[in-house]
């Protein structure tokens, strides 16, 4: 199973439309995305309590299965699970049996034998979380924490939550995504979410070497010139150069990229005065964005990090709720 196979919604949704896995935003409608945002909103205040816990996943075991490293994403998933009162296991892939030749399927079988309830999966191979969702026994939820170039649905949703907090709506908004779109799973999920939630225009601004061939099919307009692309923007999302995924010379130099596509105060001044600046992190200062902008009054980058915990709490609690509802359905059907 790969990311190019038919809609995964037979996997990620129950028969009555609840989440049971969270693999991709493809095929999910506005009501469900709005429900995720609303649920996350309700969890924001948990982080402001003296005791930052709710009992929704008490007695459940969540396994963070990260085949790619990511300090920020893994940390926020771990915090989200713990704030839901789950037990959390962080699997170190570099020392696990998988690194010693054990197959992914065997690793999963062993983890399931330990009565795990949820796997949070980050993998360099597109479609890996989908494959895992097909392989696990019923009742185990899979959350995609980023797979190859395919998708990063929780990052996109925390970005949508941040936009809604600061703009109050999606209708009428003009949003640009700037930088290395070619290698970005985040950009693909962001474009999908923005279109479903009703943004007026989604632009991508990048050199042709950093754009996928089918970029316009994703639901966006393309601009190669930063000055033109910044005009009338409500939101600008900067992406880092993913040099670890680049094959060959796609750029003359980082300095040249920054000159043409890096966000500084002068370029930000071409957007609307209340344009907000976002970045999924990690930030390469002086490559895609200057410090004065990243740390400036229009930056909401740290809000994104805070919202990551709330969004992941929402998705994890909703997916586990869907699994539990489906389990009850199976039990009732078995007694019928």
Curated annotation (Swiss-Prot):
- Quote the InterPro entries the UniProt record gives: Asp/Orn_carbamoyltranf_P-bd (IPR006132), Asp/Orn_carbamoylTrfase (IPR006130), Asp/Orn_carbamoylTrfase_sf (IPR036901), Asp_carbamoyltransf (IPR002082), Asp_carbamoyltransf_Asp/Orn-bd (IPR006131)
Keywords in alphabetical order: Pyrimidine biosynthesis, Transferase
Q: Where does L-aspartate bind?
A: 100, 185, 240
Q: Which reaction does it catalyse?
A: carbamoyl phosphate + L-aspartate = N-carbamoyl-L-aspartate + phosphate + H(+)
Q: Which GO terms describe its cellular component?
A: cytosol
A Gene Ontology BP annotation from the UniProt entry: 'de novo' UMP biosynthetic process
Q: In which pathway does it act?
A: Pyrimidine metabolism; UMP biosynthesis via de novo pathway; (S)-dihydroorotate from bicarbonate: step 2/3
Q: Which GO terms describe its molecular function?
A: amino acid binding; aspartate carbamoyltransferase activity
- Similarity comment: family membership: Belongs to the aspartate/ornithine carbamoyltransferase superfamily. ATCase family.
Describe, as the record does, how this protein assembles with itself and its partners: Heterododecamer (2C3:3R2) of six catalytic PyrB chains organized as two trimers (C3), and six regulatory PyrI chains organized as three dimers (R2).
- What name does the UniProt record give this protein? Aspartate carbamoyltransferase catalytic subunit
- GN (gene name): pyrB
């Amino acid at each position: 199973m790969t990311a190019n196979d038919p809609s995964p919604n037979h996997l990620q949704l129950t028969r009555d439309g609840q989440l049971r896995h969270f693999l991709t935003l493809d095929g999910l409608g506005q009501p469900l995305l709005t429900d995720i945002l609303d649920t996350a909103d309700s969890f924001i205040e948990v982080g402001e309590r003296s005791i930052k816990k709710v009992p929704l996943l008490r007695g459940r075991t969540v396994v963070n299965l990260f085949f790619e490293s990511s300090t920020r994403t893994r940390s926020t998933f771990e915090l989200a699970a713990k704030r839901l009162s789950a037990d959390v296991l962080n699997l170190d892939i570099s020392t696990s049996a998988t690194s010693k030749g054990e197959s992914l399927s065997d690793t999963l079988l062993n983890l399931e034998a330990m009565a795990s309830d949820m796997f949070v999966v980050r993998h360099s191979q597109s479609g890996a979380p989908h494959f895992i969702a097909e392989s696990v026994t019923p009742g185990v939820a899979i959350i995609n924490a980023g797979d190859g170039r395919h998708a990063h649905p929780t990052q996109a949703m925390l970005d949508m939550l941040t936009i809604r907090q600061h703009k109050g709506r999606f209708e009428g908004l003009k949003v640009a995504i700037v930088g290395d779109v070619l290698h970005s799973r985040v950009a693909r999920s962001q474009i999908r979410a923005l279109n479903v939630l009703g943004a007026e225009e989604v632009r991508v601004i990048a050199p042709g070497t950093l754009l996928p061939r089918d970029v316009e099919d994703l639901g966006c307009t393309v601009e190669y010139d930063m000055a033109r692309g910044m005009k009338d923007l409500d939101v600008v999302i900067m992406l880092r150069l993913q040099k670890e995924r680049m094959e060959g010379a796609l750029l003359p130099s980082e300095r040249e990229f920054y000159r043409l596509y890096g966000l500084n105060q002068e370029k930000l001044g071409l957007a609307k005065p209340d344009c907000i600046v976002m970045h999924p992190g990690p930030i390469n200062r002086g490559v895609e964005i200057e410090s004065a902008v990243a740390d400036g009054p229009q930056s909401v980058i740290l809000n994104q990090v805070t919202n990551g915990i709330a969004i992941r709490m929402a998705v994890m609690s909703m997916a586990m709720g869907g699994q539990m509802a489906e389990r009850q359905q199976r039990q009732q059907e078995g007694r019928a």
